[in-house]
Amino acid sequence: MSLHSDILVVGAGPAGLSFAAELAGSGLKITLIEKSPLEILQNPPYDGREIALTHLSREIMQRLGMWDLIPKDEIYPLRDAKVLNGQSDYQLHFPQPTQARGEPADCLGYLISNHNIRKAAYEVVSKLENVTILTGTGVKEVKTSEDEAQVILENGEVLSGRLLLAADSRFSQTRRQLGISSDMHDYSRTMFVCRMKHTLSNQ
């Protein structure tokens, strides 16, 4: 089976889904390819990742119709931040701002669980008529020519498109197959991230 689209997007995470949402109503036929099963896209499990979003990110998500799909009691404002350096007395302090992007603001940004962002993005994109989402199969091979990109899936299906977007994580196998390099640095540091409960109010 062969399917032709204007744009092929490998990876239906927040980046791939948001890209597709941006092109709603463009008339372009978009095919999203995601290795995870459909159930994972519909109800992503909590994966421990908390994403800090800026005011601009919030504006983009509002414009795309994603923001209002996130439970209000799971959007946590970041009001103040400090960066400590071991035993040093020096610290970076980011106080609560009074303005952000020319508007009154009462926080630095927002902390939202990654699975909530993924779920909201999928809910928006799944309703778009110009987007087809293929799930449960990965990419076996990628080919490009002057005219198009071709993706061969693990299930044998062949897809083609005028543009190919690799949104399959920072370790993108699609990028590697195309010979596109990346610049990564290992700083030999360890970071401890966890959720904490405390008796005092955040207010």
Question: What spans do the regions from the language model cover?
Answer:
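Glycine-rich FAD pyrophosphate-binding loop
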Residues: 24-49
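Rossmann-fold NAD(P)-dependent oxidoreductase module
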Residues: 22, 120, 124, 195
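N-terminal Rossmann-like FAD-binding beta1-loop-alpha1 element of flavoenzymes
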Residues: 5-32
